[in-house]
Regions:
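Terminal targeting signals and extreme-terminal segments of soluble enzymes
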Residues: 1-134
Length: 134
């Protein structure tokens, strides 16, 4: 497992609109992945703020990659629940999306995601997730 494997998973496993977000794998370790979501006009709202929809899509995507890094390969899964808290606007900078597997059982996996500004390091969104392992 390496960053290239995880980057390739973005192209192989996700819908074209997710690929259009141009997510980049920055780092990983087993059960943890950090992605960079580049700032773009297509994902921004008034005031160049990153939209909540883009943050949630990036969070969900990062968590699937964290599960891949946990298992060592892709294991089919589906999102059961995602709870998000938007803490502050994220404007005029890339976002770092860090996903961490908290626990994996036989049927369910649990994780948490923190999205922060790449320049200021301030947390803009926190999410918790539950996935069904298929």
């Amino acid at each position: 497992m390496n960053t290239e494997t995880l980057q390739a998973a973005l192209a192989d496993l996700f819908a074209p609109w997710v690929q259009a977000m141009n997510l980049r794998v920055e780092s990983f370790e087993p059960g943890r992945v950090t992605l960079c979501l580049p700032q773009s006009d297509q994902l921004s709202r008034i005031g160049n703020m990153l939209s909540g929809q883009a943050m949630m899509a990036a969070a969900d995507t990062a968590m699937v990659l964290a599960l891949i890094s946990h298992f060592g390969a892709f294991r089919p899964c589906t999102t059961v629940q995602m709870n998000s808290s938007f803490l502050k606007p994220l404007s005029n900078q890339d976002a770092l999306v860090e996903a961490r597997v908290l626990r994996c059982g036989k049927a369910l996996a649990f994780g948490e995601i923190d999205i922060c500004g790449a320049n200021d390091g301030k947390s803009a969104c926190r999410a918790t997730t539950t996935y069904a392992l298929l």
